[in-house]
Each structure stands twice: as structure tokens, then as C-alpha cells.
């Protein structure tokens, strides 16, 4: 399980961290009631700072997830789901306003990513006084690769098998899978692609992990 620090203030909190997972140099803080933390089998959560502050918060990390240096803040009635075999460099995730961020299976997030479902400060209309920048959920599909220093803002949905180029800021959703998104403003720059993790394969047919994309 490794060395980690865990602190809790509140009641009816459930913390379930698999004994097969490594959580070295990680700080997990839970402040509030009725919160749930699940970290599955064979995960590596290293040098991370995860903070749940509020009530009815859910953190779910599936099996075989690797995370090196996550700074994560979740507020009341929010949830973060990271599905199996996703790997993440150092980065920041912020969830508030009863929102959700979901990251699919077998994703790869390079260092410097920032994902948030909220602006964290209100903006009001001078015409009627109403707030105009409410939080919105963020959904990242399966097998998505975020390059270095990518920013994902509130309300963004990314389909399966997408590459997002380094330093791209995504503020709107895309519907087309199997593509590369890059630039400022972000746009599709390449279509009909699939990406892999290993450099030594000559073609996609040599990589058994990609079978589902062409069969």
C-alpha cells in the first residue's frame, strides 16, 4: 500500500483503498459527511494531494490507474470517476457546484493538464442580475490522449480515441471520435486516426491493444 497520509473529519465516510495499490507520498483529506473514496486494485497514486471538502462526495478510481502528482479538489455533491488503465502525469482537477468529471478507460494524460467543471467565481449579467457562468460536467471518453499542458474547461465532452495536442485549451465539446484536436482556437486537424502507447510497433495491426478500433 505504501506510505500515505490520511485525515478525516466527519461521519459516515467510506474509505476503501485496495491493499494491492501503491499510494506513496500521497495526502488524502476528507472533511465532511457521507463521502466515499474507492481506489481499486494495482493502482499507483504517487505524490498526490486529494482533498474532499463537503458532503456526499464520490471519488472512484478503477483498477490499474497510474497517477503521478495529482492535485485534486472536490466539493459537496460532486464526483470524480477515473476508469481502468488510465495513466496521468502531474496535473490539477477541480470539481464544484454539484458537478461531475468522468475520465474513461485507457486514457493517457501528460504532465501539466488542468481539468475543471467550474470557474470557481461567479459572473453576473448587468441586465438582470442573474449568474451566467454555472458549472457543467466534463466527460472524457475512452482511450483519449491529452498532450502536455492541456486545459479542459467546464461542459466539455471528448469522444473516444481522440488526441488533444499540447497546450490546447478546450472550452467546447467535440462529437467526432478518432481524431486529433489542436490549436487556438481548438479544431480538428486530423481525422480517421488511432493512437497507441508503444513506439516499437510498425503498424497498428502489430499492437493487440488496438484491435477494437479496426475489427
UniProtKB/Swiss-Prot annotation:
Q: Which Pfam families does this UniProt record tie to the protein?
A: Hexapep
What biological processes does GO assign it?
protein homotrimerization
Taxonomic lineage is: Bacteria, Pseudomonadati, Pseudomonadota, Betaproteobacteria, Neisseriales
According to the record's subunit comment, the protein's assembly and interactions are: Homotrimer.
Enzyme Commission no: 2.3.1.-
Q: Which keywords describe this protein according to UniProt? A: Transferase
Q: Name one molecular function that GO assigns to this entry.
A: polysialic-acid O-acetyltransferase activity
Give the first-level EC class, as a single word.
Answer: transferase
> This protein is called what?
Polysialic acid O-acetyltransferase
Q: Name the SUPFAM superfamilies on file.
A: Trimeric LpxA-like enzymes
Q: Which residues bind acetyl-CoA?
A: 119-121, 148, 154, 166, 171-172, 190
Which reaction is this enzyme known to catalyze? [(2->6)-alpha-D-glucosyl-(1->4)-N-acetyl-alpha-D-neuraminosyl](n) + n acetyl-CoA = [(2->6)-alpha-D-glucosyl-(1->4)-N,7-O-diacetyl-alpha-D-neuraminosyl](n) + n CoA; [(2->6)-alpha-D-glucosyl-(1->4)-N-acetyl-alpha-D-neuraminosyl](n) + n acetyl-CoA = [(2->6)-alpha-D-glucosyl-(1->4)-N,O(9)-diacetyl-alpha-D-neuraminosyl](n) + n CoA
The reply to whether Ribosomal protein figures as a keyword in the UniProt entry is no
Function as written in the Swiss-Prot or TrEMBL entry: Catalyzes the O-acetylation of capsular polymeric sialic acid consisting of polymers of (2->6)-alpha-D-glucosyl-(1->4)-N-acetyl-alpha-D-neuraminosyl residues. Shows high substrate specificity toward polymers of sialic acid that contains a large number of residues.
**Species whose genome carries this gene:** Neisseria meningitidis
Further comment found in the protein's record: Polymeric sialic acid-containing capsule provides a means for the bacteria to evade the immune response during infection by mimicking host sialic acid-containing cell surface structures. O-acetylation of the sialic acid residues of capsular polysaccharides alters their immunogenicity and susceptibility to glycosidases.
Family per UniProt? Belongs to the transferase hexapeptide repeat family.
- PANTHER family from the xrefs? LIPOPOLYSACCHARIDE BIOSYNTHESIS O-ACETYL TRANSFERASE WBBJ-RELATED, SIALIC ACID SYNTHASE-RELATED
Amino acid at each position: 500500500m505504501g506510505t500515505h497520509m490520511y485525515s478525516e473529519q466527519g461521519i459516515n465516510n467510506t474509505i476503501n483503498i485496495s491493499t494491492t495499490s501503491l499510494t506513496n507520498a500521497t495526502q488524502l483529506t476528507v472533511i465532511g459527511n457521507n463521502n466515499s473514496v474507492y481506489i481499486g486494485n494495482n493502482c499507483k497514486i504517487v505524490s498526490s494531494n486529494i482533498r474532499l471538502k463537503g458532503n456526499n462526495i464520490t471519488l472512484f478510481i478503477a483498477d490499474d490507474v497510474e497517477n503521478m502528482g495529482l492535485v485534486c479538489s472536490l466539493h459537496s455533491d460532486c464526483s470524480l470517476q477515473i476508469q481502468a488503465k488510465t495513466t496521468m502525469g502531474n496535473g490539477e482537477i477541480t470539481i464544484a457546484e454539484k458537478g461531475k468529471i468522468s475520465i474513461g478507460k485507457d486514457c493517457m494524460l501528460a504532465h501539466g493538464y488542468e481539468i475543471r467543471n467550474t470557474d470557481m467565481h461567479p459572473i453576473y449579467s448587468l441586465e438582470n442580475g442573474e449568474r451566467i457562468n454555472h458549472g457543467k460536467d466534463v466527460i472524457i471518453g475512452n482511450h483519449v490522449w491529452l498532450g502536455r499542458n492541456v486545459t479542459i474547461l467546464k461542459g466539455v465532452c471528448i469522444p473516444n480515441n481522440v488526441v488533444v495536442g499540447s497546450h490546447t485549451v478546450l472550452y467546447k465539446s467535440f462529437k467526432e471520435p478518432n481524431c486529433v484536436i489542436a490549436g487556438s482556437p481548438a479544431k480538428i486537424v486530423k481525422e480517421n486516426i488511432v493512437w497507441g502507447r508503444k513506439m516499437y510497433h510498425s503498424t497498428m495491426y502489430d499492437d493487440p491493444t488496438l484491435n477494437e478500433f479496426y475489427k
